[in-house]
């Protein structure tokens, strides 16, 4: 299979590209800096500006599957007005460019996997949220809705579209999770805020394998929550980390301190969703890491 990956140099994209190559697929990565991209042997890099099909759109006609992972890191800095605009624009512009390239192609890919976020649902308290739950009304939910809409038009062209609403993707050295682990490494771990907020998560391996599963399964279309079947509260997360790492769990971090330091960005850790992967499990996907404890043991090896 010939796969085009946009955003294939980030930590999720890099893992996906390695898995695709390991399965023997032909992979091309769209990147702003093709000359500097560090890619596995046999992976082709193609330049793009993440805003238009110019210079690369013809590659669509050589592609069986497209995966769009492009989006500026939510945790890469304080959510100033300028940064929020970059977060939104990076997602929507890339999605529209891919959609335009597919629309212009004489031969189109069979499937497009469009990345999104579990923030689509807003902040739902203790209510379970699955793929049928409505969108929230906060800023991040609105961005997620627009992100998903950016490639919706390909469905009218007969392209099977899968939307992956990612929870926080866990990796021991990359992404946001090393920051979660840091207080425990320093022996000052404790609950954040009330500790009752939900922490939706998925192990990196499952995020990658679920993507491959949906690409290959021709019955898969529509929205899928990329979240483990065992969502945990912040308090349970902290206690599990402390137990696995054999660290104390005594030092609470008040919500007001998080809000003072991080501003609106603090909502990523002070609020959350009790998300479950209903459609993914109904389709038959079996999680490699269904529980937080099992995931932590693997990540901290």
Question: Where do the language-model regions lie?
Answer:
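N-terminal Rossmann NAD(P)H-binding glycine-rich loop of SDR-like oxidoreductase domains
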Residues: 3-23
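NAD(P)H-binding glycine-rich loop region in Rossmannoid oxidoreductase-like domains
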Residues: 35-39, 43-94
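Conserved Rossmann-fold NAD(P)-dependent oxidoreductase catalytic core, especially the SDR/UDP-sugar
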Residues: 84-86, 96-138
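Conserved beta-loop-beta element that borders a ligand/cofactor-binding pocket
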Residues: 116, 149-172
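Glycine-rich "substrate-gating" loop/helix at the edge of Rossmann-like oxidoreductase active sites
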Residues: 135-140, 166-174, 194-204, 215
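Alpha-helical substrate-binding/gating segment
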Residues: 181-189, 197-231
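Mid/C-terminal beta-alpha module of Rossmann-like enzyme folds, strongest
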Residues: 217-264, 297-300
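C-terminal amphipathic/interface module of NAD(P)-dependent oxidoreductases
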Residues: 267-301
